[in-house]
Amino acid sequence: MKQAAPGLTPRLSNVTLVAVTGVALAATIEALLASMAKAQFAAVLLLSDQPPRGDMTGIEWRRIQPIKTREDYSRFMLRELADHIATPHALCVQWDGYVLDGAAWDPAFLDYDYIGAPWPHFSDGHRVGNGGFSLRSRRLLEACRQLPIEPPILEDVIICRRLRPQLEQQGIRFAPEALARRFSYERIRPEGNEFGFHGAFNLVRHMSASHALRVFRDLEPKMLARNERWELLGWAVRRGRIGLALEMIRRLA
């Protein structure tokens, strides 16, 4: 499939960029703005119970019920996201992931109902994929309304693993792993030509030291999982990022 020309931002007139959050509001807005700098979308939505501050140019905020837990987030993504999406597809992002390279966009991404970074820790062929930076069709969003919610299983695992056979029986198509690796990376080593990424442990690769430190200092105290804090501490120590290392030590205390 033909990809966008180098240096050009693709016009994704059939894609809504959307973030759903109750935490890390400033970082989430930054992720939306970073994505908007690399691609043009039909609409850009921030769905949150908190009114945003700062630069919201081109972003529409819609108030939703508070998202206080991962279960709240999963329930919203499965049951209510479809109410806000008017385009055939939605690009779902979180605070720790965004579009890296608009030239890496491939129209073939739109041939599928779900595409996200492959998970390396599964070996059964159902490794696609991560929901934190994922492209989903409206058809998938509507189908998800009928899926049973099984806390504490996360919504992307419900969609892509637990109930994937049920969705495929309805004609839902999951992207092949080779295409998903070009779409995004998370826990698999990047090849350098991905459209986007997800993960706090990857965010630091794409920010200056001062920018990353500001983002992490602004996060709510319990935002990062303990393993993420250890991972970021090790990364910072190996690269001499003293400020970030001290921030992770503070969060581990």
Model feature map: region roles:
Residues 1-33:
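N-proximal low-complexity "stem/linker" segments adjacent to membrane-targeting elements
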Residues 97-128:
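Conserved donor-nucleotide/metal-binding helix-loop-beta segment in metal-dependent transferases, i.e.
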Residues 87-98:
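Short beta-strand-to-loop acidic/aromatic patch adjacent to the donor-nucleotide binding site
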Residues 44, 95-96, 137, 159:
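Generic structural signal for small/hydrophobic residues in well-ordered secondary structure
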Residues 128-236, 243:
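Catalytic core and acceptor-binding pocket of nucleotide-sugar-dependent glycosyltransferases
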Residues 47-88:
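Active-site-proximal specificity loops/subdomain of glycosyltransferases
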Residues 31-42:
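Short, acidic, metal-binding catalytic loop of nucleotide-sugar glycosyltransferases
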